[in-house]
């Protein structure tokens, strides 16, 4: 009996895949890297079915989303296959994982998109061209590597105060609403001989703080105080430093759900149920 809906978030080089069973449970999400979206998709799908001992006739439907989905117009392994609009998938997945009905979803990928969820309304409200691609590109120039594991390891020994200018550097007293350790200017305190460790930390903070600030600004006049972070950048350890500091400063809540990396794939699978109601 067909029970499982497969959601696949197809990137250019990375594909994420999840299954959702009849009870609504998420089954063993995985990610696969490859040189192109077709190889990535079929590699991920085959591995997923094999690892979870799922037969083809147990799959009710396959839902595709993500930029790489545009390259695929055929049925996957002959199975019924449809597509989910990526921003809708972002919203559905984040709503499912966070259990919130009203929020802004912050999809931190190569760049960053912002999706407003207000009960059943899911709407893309903008974004910024800063994200994982920014971190990788600047790291290639400044650190001579775009290996995210190496960047994270360097940042562990970095001191962001040697890179960013803080309020305490320019004022003898806190400013209204701004404590002494708040950032006045990103990278403004960097020296010509800054260490690779400090640069790595500064780059990560710059990307995360920029995303956080854009998110808060996007929420003005909406009354929304809950922001759900999804995508690969949620795996950065510095998220546990940057976003709590912004929560305290602005009175908002940044949430990283359990399957933050896979929310878009989860949302794609959920969209099938929504489309067939």
Describe every region a protein language model picked out.
Residues 120-175:
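Glycine-rich phosphate-binding loop plus the immediately following alpha-helix
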Residues 64-70, 217-246, 261:
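Glycine-rich phosphate-binding loops at beta-strand->alpha-helix junctions
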Residues 176-226:
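Adenine-nucleotide phosphate-binding core of ATP-dependent small-molecule kinases
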Residues 2-43, 122:
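Short glycine-rich, Thr/Ser-proximal phosphate-binding strand/loop in the N-terminal lobe
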Residues 30-34, 45-46, 50-86, 119-124:
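Short beta-strand-loop/turn "lid" adjacent to the catalytic site in phosphate-handling enzymes
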Residues 81-87, 244-266:
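Conserved phosphate-binding/catalytic loops in two-lobed NTP-binding clefts
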Residues 92-97, 135-139, 254-277:
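Glycine-rich phosphate-binding/hydrolytic loop that grips phosphoryl groups
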Residues 1, 72-106, 111-121, 266-274:
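Conserved phosphate-binding catalytic cores of ATP/NTP-utilizing and phosphoryl-transfer enzymes
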């Amino acid at each position: 009996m067909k029970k499982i809906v497969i959601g696949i978030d197809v990137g250019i080089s990375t594909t994420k895949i999840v299954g959702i069973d009849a009870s609504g449970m998420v089954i063993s999400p995985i990610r696969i890297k490859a040189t192109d979206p077709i190889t990535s998709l079929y590699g991920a799908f085959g591995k997923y079915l094999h690892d979870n001992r799922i037969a083809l006739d147990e799959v009710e439907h396959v839902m595709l989303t993500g930029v790489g989905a545009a390259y695929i117009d055929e049925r996957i392994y002959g199975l019924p296959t449809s597509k989910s609009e990526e921003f809708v998938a972002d919203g559905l997945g984040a709503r499912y994982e966070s259990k919130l009905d009203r929020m802004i979803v912050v999809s931190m990928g190569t760049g960053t998109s912002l999706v407003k969820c207000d009960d059943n309304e899911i709407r893309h409200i903008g974004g910024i061209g800063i994200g994982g691609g920014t971190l990788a590109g600047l790291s290639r120039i400044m650190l001579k590597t775009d290996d995210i594991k190496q960047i994270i390891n360097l940042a562990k020994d970095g001191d962001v105060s040697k890179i960013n200018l803080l309020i305490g550097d320019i004022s003898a007293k806190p400013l209204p609403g701004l404590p002494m350790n708040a950032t006045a200017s990103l990278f403004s305190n960097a020296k010509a001989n800054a260490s690779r460790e400090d640069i790595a930390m500064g780059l990560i903070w710059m990307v995360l703080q920029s995303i956080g600030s854009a998110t808060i600004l996007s929420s003005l006049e909406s009354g929304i105080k809950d922001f759900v972070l999804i995508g690969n950048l949620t795996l950065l350890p510095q998220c546990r430093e940057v976003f709590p500091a912004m929560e305290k400063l602005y009175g908002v809540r940044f949430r990283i759900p359990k399957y933050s990396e896979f929310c878009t794939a989860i949302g794609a699978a959920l969209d099938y149920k929504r489309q067939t109601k």
